[in-house]
């Protein structure tokens, strides 16, 4: 793994094509024309987001009321395509960052930095570096983890596990953090920290999945910006992220007429609904289908596996800039499939044994009052959010599709719902969409515009943002379920 310095806005993991490596040896910063990074998203035309914002005055009110930065940042602009959800998001985020709670304000922002650093999300790191200083944080802490108090350092292990393999968290991890001593965490403090970590891991998925651009610097007036290479290769940036690479456009991103693709999806939804009404699968059959889907997720390639294509123009180079690495311990630790090939692995997390509604919600509310209500409202909002449309079709019940997206994320994290037929996942989620979901959820820093464009090509950008919101909240809930279950076991 190479390491190098970078600008303060540098993000980290990215694929390097051979030609660009030569350029990067000379300068980690590449001068590109400002129009290539104009607007809140590199994936969504600026006019689509701007139109939504000008029409909806509610967004401006929400920003004034709940934004910690006091301005309409790029995340908020993209989320404003779904104003109902945006309100739930901003209220919960404002509560965990600014309202009364167990942790001091600077700690909250430093924990956000630590969480974002696990996915090398410079956008969030920069945002919370500013907020950390504004709330009275000690500037020396920004030099890296070796400069922070030991009790913050002690969060590294649970931060790492939550971000990449939450199923490994046990009550022993909790006991280690709350044991008696000068650096111990109280349970309310730990719950607050866990909520922040899960929130910012998941938000990093949204940032990369939606192609959120760096905030514009008002001091730049010459039409050019020095930007650091993010999760795109340099030639992606120069060509608006349109990679001309056969290895990325083979069987994984099969070219299908997008109209017939949409009609086929609609037909599958209709057929599944009819089958569901005709007969109900047995519990044994449902369990078998979950295990099958869990194992099949092993073979869904994600962003990092593009490296393994033979004779690819991409090389297995990962650069973590010093600006990000200072906040990370064990940078090589990442996601591994819950069901690894040829191995007897960890037992499946049966959602019915520890649910958010019956267990997690009450524990969070008991130890960190009111955040449970805000999180619950946000989870319900995104899960039930619908406009009853699919691309150009109206009066469509999308419940089945939303549930498949949510449950597929949980499946990759080893969480099973006894009452869900996982055969529906294979019927409803095409391979290119599964690639996108796995990358955004498990390796968000590797998401590319090509992947975003490759699925549901007839759908509106607002519908794809809705997908990203579902993925973000499904991921956050999965992390919380594992962490809160471990805390519950510690208490019993």
From Swiss-Prot:
Subunit structure: Interacts with the GATOR2 complex which is composed of MIOS, SEC13, SEH1L, WDR24 and WDR59; the interaction is not regulated by leucine. Interacts with RRAGA, RRAGB, RRAGC and RRAGD; may function as a guanine nucleotide dissociation inhibitor for RRAGs and regulate them. Interacts with the TORC2 complex; through RICTOR.
Source domain of life: Eukaryota
InterPro entries: AhpD-like, Sestrin
Family the UniProt entry places it in: Belongs to the sestrin family.
Taxonomic lineage from the root: Eukaryota, Metazoa, Chordata, Craniata, Vertebrata
Annotated stretches, region: C-terminal domain: 310-492
Region (N-terminal domain) residue spans: 62-243
Main location: cytoplasm
One cellular component (GO) term of this entry: TORC2 complex
Alphabetically ordered keywords of this record: Cytoplasm, Oxidoreductase
GO process terms (BP): cellular response to amino acid starvation; cellular response to glucose starvation; cellular response to L-leucine; cellular response to leucine starvation; glucose homeostasis; negative regulation of TORC1 signaling; positive regulation of macroautophagy; regulation of insulin receptor signaling pathway
The species this protein was found in: Homo sapiens
GO molecular function, one term: L-leucine binding
Subcellular location as annotated: Cytoplasm
Record's comment describing the protein's domains: The N-terminal domain may have an alkylhydroperoxide reductase activity.
Disulphide bridges: none
UniProt xrefs under PANTHER family: P53 REGULATED PA26 NUCLEAR PROTEIN SESTRIN (PTHR12474), SESTRIN-3 (PTHR12474:SF4)
Protein name listed in UniProt: Sestrin-3
Protein's gene: SESN3
The reaction(s) this protein catalyses: a hydroperoxide + L-cysteinyl-[protein] = S-hydroxy-L-cysteinyl-[protein] + an alcohol
Active-site residues from the entry: 121 (cysteine sulfenic acid (-soh) intermediate)
Tissues showing expression: Widely expressed.
Chain's role: May function as an intracellular leucine sensor that negatively regulates the TORC1 signaling pathway. May also regulate the insulin-receptor signaling pathway through activation of TORC2. This metabolic regulator may also play a role in protection against oxidative and genotoxic stresses. May prevent the accumulation of reactive oxygen species (ROS) through the alkylhydroperoxide reductase activity born by the N-terminal domain of the protein.
Binding site for L-leucine: 386-389, 398, 463
């Amino acid at each position: 793994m190479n390491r190098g310095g970078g600008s303060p806005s540098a993000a980290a993991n990215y694929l390097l094509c051979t030609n660009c490596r030569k350029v990067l040896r000379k300068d980690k910063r590449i001068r590109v024309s400002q129009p290539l990074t104009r607007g809140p998203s590199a994936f969504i035309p600026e006019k689509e987001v701007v139109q939504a914002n000008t029409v909806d005055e509610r967004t401006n009110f929400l920003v004034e009321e709940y934004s910690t930065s006091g301005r309409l940042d790029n995340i908020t602009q993209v989320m404003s395509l779904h104003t109902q959800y945006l309100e739930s998001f901003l209220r919960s985020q404002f509560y965990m960052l600014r309202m009364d709670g167990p942790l001091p304000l600077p700690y909250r922002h430093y924990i956000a930095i630590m969480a974002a650093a696990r996915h090398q999300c410079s956008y969030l790191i920069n945002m919370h570096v500013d907020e950390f200083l504004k709330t009275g944080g000690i500037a020396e802490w920004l030099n890296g983890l070796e400069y922070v108090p030991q009790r913050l350092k002690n969060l590294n292990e649970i931060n790492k596990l939550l971000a990449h393999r939450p199923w490994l968290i046990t009550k022993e991890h909790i006991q280690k953090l709350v044991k008696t001593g000068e650096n111990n965490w109280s349970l309310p403090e730990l719950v607050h920290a866990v909520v922040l970590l899960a929130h910012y891991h998941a938000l990093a998925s949204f940032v990369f999945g939606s192609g959120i651009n760096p905030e514009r610097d008002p001091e730049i007036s010459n039409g050019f910006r020095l930007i650091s290479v993010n999760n795109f290769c340099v030639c992606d940036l120069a060509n608006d992220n349109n990679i001309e690479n056969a290895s990325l456009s083979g069987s994984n991103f099969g070219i299908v007429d997008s109209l017939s693709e949409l009609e086929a999806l609609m037909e599958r939804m209709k057929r599944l609904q009819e089958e569901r009404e005709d007969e109900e699968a047995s519990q044994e059959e449902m369990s078998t289908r979950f295990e099958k889907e869990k194992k099949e997720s092993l073979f869904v390639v994600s962003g990092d596996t593009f490296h393994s294509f033979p004779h690819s123009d991409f090389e297995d180079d990962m650069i973590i800039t010093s600006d990000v690495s200072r906040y990370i311990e064990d940078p090589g630790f990442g996601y591994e499939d819950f069901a690894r090939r040829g191995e007897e692995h960890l037992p499946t997390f049966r959602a019915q044994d520890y649910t958010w509604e019956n267990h997690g919600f009450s524990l969070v509310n008991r130890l960190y009052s009111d955040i449970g209500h805000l999180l619950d409202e946000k989870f319900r909002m995104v899960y039930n959010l619908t406009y009853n449309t699919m691309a150009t079709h109206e009066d469509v019940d999308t419940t089945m599709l939303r549930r498949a997206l949510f449950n597929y994320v949980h499946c990759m994290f080893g969480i099973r719902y006894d009452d869900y037929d996982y055969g529906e996942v294979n019927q409803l989620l095409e391979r290119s969409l599964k690639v996108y979901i796995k990358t955004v959820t498990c390796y968000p820093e590797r998401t590319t515009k090509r992947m975003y464009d490759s699925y549901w090509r007839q759908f509106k950008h607002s519908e794809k943002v809705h997908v990203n919101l579902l993925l973000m909240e499904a991921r956050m809930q999965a992390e919380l379920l594992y962490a809160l279950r471990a805390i519950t076991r510690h208490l019993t």
